[in-house]
Amino acid sequence: MPNKMSAEKRVRVSEKRRVLNKAYKTSMKNKIKAVLAAIAQKKSAEEIMELFRKAQSAIDKAAKSGAIHKNQASRRKSRLAVKVKAYLGAEKQGV
């Protein structure tokens, strides 16, 4: 247990931030998984693009709040975009 008032406050603040960061990260990961699941189930292009936009938004919100680093956000969006683009390209060719 902290002895100083400022140390007690740091414990409160860090616990509050931990819970918020966990919520941002969980939301982001669930939306990414939804996109990947839609690709695996061969859903329509419109549906995948809608899920992809929501995933991008969740990733950006997590980065904006500081839950993840901006470079990690960029990397996650880029890798997800590559997978979506590959699927949509294959779908156009009728594979």
From Swiss-Prot:
Top-rank taxon, per record: Bacteria
InterPro entries: Ribosomal_bS20, Ribosomal_bS20_sf
Keywords: Ribonucleoprotein, Ribosomal protein, RNA-binding, rRNA-binding
Gene Ontology annotations of biological process type: translation
Membrane-spanning parts: none
GO cellular component: cytosol; small ribosomal subunit
Disulfide topology: none
PANTHER family registered for this protein in UniProt: 30S RIBOSOMAL PROTEIN S20, SMALL RIBOSOMAL SUBUNIT PROTEIN BS20C
Function: Binds directly to 16S ribosomal RNA.
Protein name per UniProt: Small ribosomal subunit protein bS20
Organism: Fervidobacterium nodosum (strain ATCC 35602 / DSM 5306 / Rt17-B1)
Gene of this entry: rpsT
